Each structure stands twice: as structure tokens, then as C-alpha cells.
Amino acid sequence: MDQVYLPQSVRTAVAVSFGVGLLYWVYRLLLQKTKSLKALDLPVLQSVGDQDIVKTLEEGHAKYPDTPFALGVPGQQLVVLPVSEIDTVKALPENQLSIKKHHYNQFLGEYSYMGTKADEFDDAMRYLLVRNTPAVLASFTAEIDYAMSTVLQVPPNSWTRVKPRSIMPKVATILSGRAFVGLPLSREPDWIESNVNYTQDVSRAWMVLRFYPHWIRPLVAPFLREVKTLEQNKALIGRKIAKLLADQEAQKLSPAQEKIPGGDMIDWFKSRYQAQGKTATAQQLTRDQLLATFASIYNLSNALTYVMFDLAANPAAVDELREELDQVLGPNVGAESIDKTALPRLIKLDSFVRESQRLSPTSLVNIPRIVTDPNGLRLKTGHVIPPGYLVMVRAQPINQSPTLYPNPERFDAFRFARLRQQGGANENRWQHTSTGADNINFGHGIWACPGRFFASAEIKVVVAYVIRHYDLRLIEGRPHPKPKYGGLAIFPDAGAEVELKPRV
């Protein structure tokens, strides 16, 4: 059949009509959201784009510092709670406030497994992972040289530009994979690529699908490239896990071999199922592995990226961190020697990492929950939030509090080390992994991130390795890279660079 060519004027008219129709559809969606939020009898703030969200939240907090307000952002609507409500929400069970429902909705649980985790997964993460931090740390230190030398190939005797956001997902995948599934699987190129892509595709798919109503997502999602590759990566990882389990069964029949660090997480997952009289299937363990992978790679690689920016911007602090490594590990001893006794003594390093997180958290708000109590969520302010609504606690007023942190806008590398020197409860209160009303960047309460000890240990091993082996600096004439925003999420600039030079 001959092709039909429309005149330019006709094509333009069609394009304009489509654009007008699309704008009207978006307008109708925003209008529907506003009506829904107005039904709450709360003040409503509307952010029309990702880049004005910070300003909108600051405006809301300035006007309503001690009471909730409703917020509409691109693709999302929620109730923003004041800091005073942290104690209200921190300990409520799933049948009153659900973090799982939030994760399922936010991270496309029907495609990603998010929000579908089993009790056995929670037990393994909450108890076995925390209890066995020394074993996890041993896997990191055993793998750090391989991970960094594989991913970060910098020629000697010269400054080389690198993009931390490009390299850190692979570093996090290799290190976490050593702890999760062990060698040799954790080093297989297709395993690394699939885990990195899975994590990135979850967030990319959400960035697109958030603009569609929930009822239409099942119609749109199968046609998205991100969802297609998400399914492909899930399938490959599932096949790898099934083979790993088969190999483990076969090894039981072989003579015992000396245990090398790594591969503990899969065993911990299996043990929690066995404790309940169950045998974990390959599909269940694949789901558990992917859930752990997303948490470790996405948040961890972002945190490592921010830390790299902060190291490059603060050379004097880097010198002090190296001195601390000398004092704790010994002169010129590398990150490979960090163990369970050395890690808690790296107080300045802990402070540096927490300060980086304070100024570059994962989200502008935290402690996300969907109200599931049929009677709603009753706040201290007297407001009742009906079931089905998303609530979150504002985090920026804490992170930027001049009362808690003098000159809060300034990066002060050893701010928390000085606070810990005050002694008493301050020793624990100001650690990187501590949560409370003064730090909700890991959440708080019964659903505080159980992997924060895992993440903190991994970040410190990477930082120790980097500053032992490289000098860092910002590119001359360029400012400290600024974060990007997608909805309420904060993520580092993927195009931002720093310069590295191997140390002699």
C-alpha cells in the first residue's frame, strides 16, 4: 500500500490538538487530586513541577509548622505531618498504618515485588542481618579491592574525571552481592548488570507511571520499556537463584570446604522459612533477594555518590579521616583490615557519613504510611486522616534545624563527632545509624530501616578504600553538585563529575 503523506499544516493541527487534549487530561487529574485533598478539611498546597517541591514544602512548614497540611505533587498526593507526630506514627501496626501498602503503590509492587515481602523476609532483615553484621562486614572487606579495581579504572599519575552516580551502583551491587549470594555468582557480569538494571528500572518505571491513574497502569505498563526489562531481569535473576540453590544442595553431598566470607543472606532467608516449618521456593527467595537488592543498591549507591561529592569538596576533612584510619588500623593499612572492633572506633568517619546524609537524604519527607485503620488516623492535633490516605512526616525541618545544627546549611564534617564527645546518651544518639525525633532519614520506630547497619558498614568500607587509594577534588570552576528531585524523592546528579588521582 502507498504511504499517505499529510500536509505540514494538517500534521501541525493534529499535534496541537493532541497537545491540548493531553494538557486538559493532566489538568483534570490535578483537579481531581485537589478535590480529593480538599475533602480532608486541611490546607492544600499544590506543586506543579518536581523542581519547585522544596519551595512548596518550605512554604507549608512556614505556614503550618505544628499542624498537618495536604500536598499534591506530580503523580502523588499525601498528608504531610508535623515533626510532633513522629511518636504518633512510629509504632502503629500494619492494620492501622501500612508501610507495605505504600511500598506496593510507590514502587509498582505488581511488577517489582515491592510491598509483597513475607514475614520471613522481615525476620531475616530485622534480626539475622543486624545480629550478623560482623559476617557481612567480613564479606565487604574481602571484596572491596575487587569491586573498586573492577569498576574504577583510573590511570596512574594523572587526574581522571569520573561520574560517581555511574560507578556506584555497580560497586554496591558487587559488594552487596558478595554478602547476599556469595562467590562466584556475585561476580558474574550478567548477574551484576541485571541487578543494577532491575533497581534502576523500578525507579524509572515509577517516574513514568506516577502520572497515570492506578486503574489505567495495568494497561500502560506492559508497553513500557522499563517494565519489559524489569520482567526480563527478574526472570534472569530467578534462574540464577534456582541454579544457586541446586548447587548448594549438590555441595551438601561433597566433602566440607572451608567457609569463605559471603553468601550468608540466602542462608538466613532459608533459615527463617525453616523455622516456620516451610521450605523456601526459588521464587520466594528470588523475591526476597530482589527486595534486599533494591534497598541496598538504590539507596546505597545514591549515598555513596553524595559521599564522593563531599569528599571531593572537603580535602581538609579527608586528611583528618586518613589520620583516623592510621590511628585505628595502623599507618597505611587499608580498608580490607576494618573489622568489628575497628568499625565503631572510626568516629570521624561515622560523623562524615551522617553529615552527608543529613544534607543529602533520600527524601524530603519520611516514615511513609497508608492509613489502614477503618476509623482513620487520629493525630495529636485533633485531626483525623481517613483510611486510604498516604501520610508522611516532614524531614527537612529536622535536617535543616538551626536548633539541632548550628549553621545547618553548611557541611560540617565532624559535627556529629563533637556531639558524641559530650558523653552519656549522646554517644549513641548521634551515630549514623541512630534514629529518633532528630533523625528520620532511616525512618524511625518499628519499621526503621533494618538494613541501615549493613548500609553504614558498606559505605565506610568504600570511603576508607577510596581515601587510602585516591586523592579527590571537584572540577575547577564547578560548584558542589546539586541534587535532583522526582516527586518527593531526592537523587544525585547523574552527570556530575569529580576528579580522582591514584595516591603514590
From Swiss-Prot:
Keyword field contains Ion transport: no
Keyword Heme applies: yes
Entry keywords, A to Z: Glycoprotein, Heme, Iron, Membrane, Metal-binding, Monooxygenase, Oxidoreductase, Transmembrane, Transmembrane helix, Virulence
Residues at which heme binds: 449
Single GO molecular function: iron ion binding
Metabolic or biological pathway, per its Swiss-Prot or TrEMBL entry: Mycotoxin biosynthesis
Pfam families reported for this sequence: p450
Glycosylation sites: 197, 299
Listed transmembrane segments: 13-31
Cell location: Membrane
GO cellular component entries: membrane
Entries under SUPFAM superfamilies matching the protein: Cytochrome P450
Organism domain of life: Eukaryota
A GO BP annotation: symbiont-mediated suppression of host immune response
Main subcellular location of this protein, as a coarse class: membrane
EC number: 1.-.-.-
Record's signal peptide: none
Topology class, membrane: Single-pass membrane protein
Required cofactor names: heme
Top-level EC class: oxidoreductase
Stated role: Cytochrome P450 monooxygenase; part of the gene cluster that mediates the biosynthesis of gliotoxin, a member of the epipolythiodioxopiperazine (ETP) class of toxins characterized by a disulfide bridged cyclic dipeptide. The first step in gliotoxin biosynthesis is the condensation of serine and phenylalanine to form the cyclo-L-phenylalanyl-L-serine diketopiperazine (DKP) by the NRPS gliP.
Protein family membership: Belongs to the cytochrome P450 family.
Protein name: Cytochrome P450 monooxygenase gliF
Taxonomic lineage: Eukaryota, Fungi, Dikarya, Ascomycota, Pezizomycotina
The encoding gene: gliF
